[in-house]
UniProtKB/Swiss-Prot annotation:
Organism: Chaetosphaeridium globosum (Charophycean green alga)
Function of the protein: NDH shuttles electrons from NAD(P)H:plastoquinone, via FMN and iron-sulfur (Fe-S) centers, to quinones in the photosynthetic chain and possibly in a chloroplast respiratory chain. The immediate electron acceptor for the enzyme in this species is believed to be plastoquinone. Couples the redox reaction to proton translocation, and thus conserves the redox energy in a proton gradient.
Biological process terms in GO annotation: photosynthesis, light reaction
Reaction(s) this enzyme catalyzes, per UniProt: a plastoquinone + NADH + (n+1) H(+)(in) = a plastoquinol + NAD(+) + n H(+)(out); a plastoquinone + NADPH + (n+1) H(+)(in) = a plastoquinol + NADP(+) + n H(+)(out)
Gene: ndhJ
Annotated protein name in UniProt: NAD(P)H-quinone oxidoreductase subunit J, chloroplastic
Length: 168
């Protein structure tokens, strides 16, 4: 999963070059179809890189989500950051991907950098089981607290019986 982390085969963008000039470890993954630069970050490096990006002007966490890469494989947490500035027609964006093993998946929470990560990290925890360390209220947000398993994992087995509770 991360054994190719230091091998760079993608073209570096502006943000990747800036991170490299500041000796911040990352791996460029190229650009998406809209031209947004995508970077891979290791979980242990995420807090310092998140703060560096925030200080560099990426003041808006547009979206945080997660996905199961393939059955039995790693889980991914994805962050879309935007540099919101006055009088800018095209705001600068970056996509950060963090891959973790499905056994004991842990990533440091960036709630303390971008408050909008609160519910988004909770939803990813609820659906995929990625634990966001130091999150102030990491508990299920969509599923009942008694729910077993992580519904968006590709190896999730749907229960045969659901107990429906009447609201009245």
């Amino acid at each position: 999963m991360l054994d190719l982390f230091n091998k760079t085969s993608q073209v570096q963008g502006r943000i990747s070059a800036w991170l490299a000039s500041n000796n911040l470890p990352h791996r460029p993954l190229g650009f998406d179809y809209q031209g947004v630069e995508t970077l891979q970050i290791k979980p242990e490096d995420w807090p310092s890189i998140a703060v560096a990006l925030y200080v560099n002007g990426f003041n808006y966490l547009r979206c945080q989500c997660g996905y199961d890469v393939y059955p039995g494989g790693p889980l991914a947490s994805v962050y879309y950051l935007t540099k919101v500035d006055d009088n800018v027609d095209q705001p600068e964006e970056v996509c950060i991907k963090i891959f973790v093993p499905r056994e004991n998946p842990k990533i440091p929470s960036i709630f303390w950098v971008w408050k909008t990560a609160d519910y988004q990290e909770r939803e990813t925890y609820d659906m995929l089981g990625i634990v966001y360390e130091s999150h102030p209220n990491l508990k299920r947000i969509l599923m009942p607290e008694s729910w077993l398993g992580w519904p968006l994992r590709k190896d999730y087995i749907t229960p045969d019986f659901y107990e429906l509770q009447d609201a009245y």
